Every structure is written in structure tokens, then in C-alpha cells.
A protein has these predicted regions:
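N-terminal secretory signal peptides that target proteins for export/translocation
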Residues: 1-11
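A subset of signal/propeptide-processing and intrinsically disordered low-complexity segments
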Residues: 3-5, 18, 47
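Generic detector of short alpha-helix boundary/capping microenvironments
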Residues: 9, 17-18, 59
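Compositionally biased, intrinsically disordered low-complexity regions enriched in proline and serine
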Residues: 9-11, 24, 40, 208
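Bacterial N-terminal signal peptides
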Residues: 17-26
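Autoinhibitory N-terminal propeptides
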Residues: 30-212
């Protein structure tokens, strides 16, 4: 076999490997449903104006699994939004004043944002994780989002599966909270309500309630 033929064969093999490296991730994305949704410029503007970053990500790349989201309206949810929410087939998991926890799928995000009575919306988490929230904490969270004070620090009592340690503290800090005191598996922390979704992601936390 001549040197020229050998070089040509090696070049073709290298080209094939390069093409495979480029197209394999794209093919995998198609096979596993990792397809980015496209929106019109007005819809993109709505996502930037009314949705938090995690909710925008769900709208663009989410699948079909429902999740809980916080929605803040201009008017009282029970008195003024019940009929509209019913027509849109959205499930209200809880509500207080102008704020509601809705069960959404990614495809319902933009239609919700198009409602002129909606002020803002934020991703919260899988519905089953709401069971870790004390009812009074959930209502306080709704009240604070409605009043626009969700960024202010609040005291929370976190109950862990055991006494916890450095890894648990890193998760608490990553959610925007700081540890005030510890008593065995019970930690008193302080931070903004906007950090609750990240706290809920930790399987080490079994329950959350308002701090005394």
C-alpha cells in the first residue's frame, strides 16, 4: 500500500471521527427529547419581564412533567382570577390574596405570562416537595411574594434527617441562607423566601417551618 493511499485513508477516518463528535450530541438530544423551544420576540420579552430564570429555563428546555410555580397577580386570586384560571385548566394548589401556587407544565408557562393580570411568576419545584413545608410557612411565603418582600430575610426552622454537617451547611448557604443555631437535627437559619426552592431540593431536609 502506497504512502499516499495510507494518508488518504487516515484522513478520511479522522474526518469521520470529527463529524461523529459534532453530530452525536445533536442526535442524542433529539433521541432523548432535549429540544429547545423557540418563541417569538414578544414572547421572549414576556419571559424576561415576568418569569424568574429557572421558570424561563423550564419554558425553553423543559419536558412535559408538571411542577409547582408561584404566580403573583394584580388582583385577589379567589375573587378575581378563579374563573380565568378555571378556563385555562390550571390547577391552584394554594392561594393567598394576590398570590397562588399553580401546577404548571412547561407548555403552559408562556400562555400564563400572556395574562395581563399576571405580574410575575417563579418556579418552585416538584409538587410532592410541598409536603415538606409547614402550612403556616407556605401561607407566609405567599403573602411575602404578594407584597413584594420575598427578598427580605426570614427565620426558618429546618429539620434534617440527622444532625447534619459541612455538606448540609454548604447547601443552606448555596440557597442564600446562613445558619444561626443548631440543636441536633434542627437548624435555625435566616435568608430570603426566594431561596426556599433550593432548600427543597435537599433530600436531607424533611420539614421546614417558620422560626420562632
Amino acid at each position: 500500500m502506497s504512502d499516499t493511499l495510507l494518508r488518504n485513508r487516515n484522513s478520511r477516518r479522522l474526518l469521520s471521527l470529527l463529524l461523529l463528535a459534532v453530530y452525536l450530541p445533536l442526535l442524542s438530544g433529539c433521541l432523548f427529547g432535549e429540544k429547545r423551544r423557540t418563541y417569538s420576540p414578544p414572547e421572549e420579552e414576556l419571559l424576561r419581564a415576568k418569569a424568574d430564570p429557572r421558570l424561563r429555563k423550564e419554558a425553553e428546555t423543559g419536558g412535559s412533567e408538571p411542577f409547582a410555580a408561584i404566580a403573583v397577580f394584580n388582583n385577589d386570586v379567589f375573587l378575581d382570577q378563579s374563573e380565568a384560571l378555571g378556563r385555562s385548566s390550571l390547577t391552584v394548589l394554594n392561594e393567598m390574596g394576590r398570590t397562588a401556587i399553580l401546577l404548571l407544565s412547561p407548555g403552559q408557562i408562556v400562555p400564563l405570562l400572556k395574562d395581563p393580570s399576571l405580574r410575575k411568576a417563579a418556579w418552585f419545584g416538584p409538587q410532592e416537595l410541598l409536603a415538606r413545608l409547614d402550612p403556616s410557612l407556605e401561607l407566609d411565603m405567599l403573602t411575602r411574594f404578594g407584597a413584594g418582600t420575598e427578598d427580605r430575610d426570614v427565620d426558618l426552622l429546618l429539620r434534617f434527617v440527622d444532625v447534619g454537617g459541612a455538606e448540609e451547611e454548604r447547601r443552606v448557604v448555596a440557597a442564600g441562607f446562613r445558619v444561626v443555631t443548631r440543636a441536633g437535627p434542627n437548624w435555625l437559619v435566616t435568608g430570603p423566601m426566594t431561596g426556599l426552592p433550593k432548600l427543597l431540593e435537599s433530600d436531607r431536609i424533611t420539614y421546614m417551618e417558620k422560626g420562632s
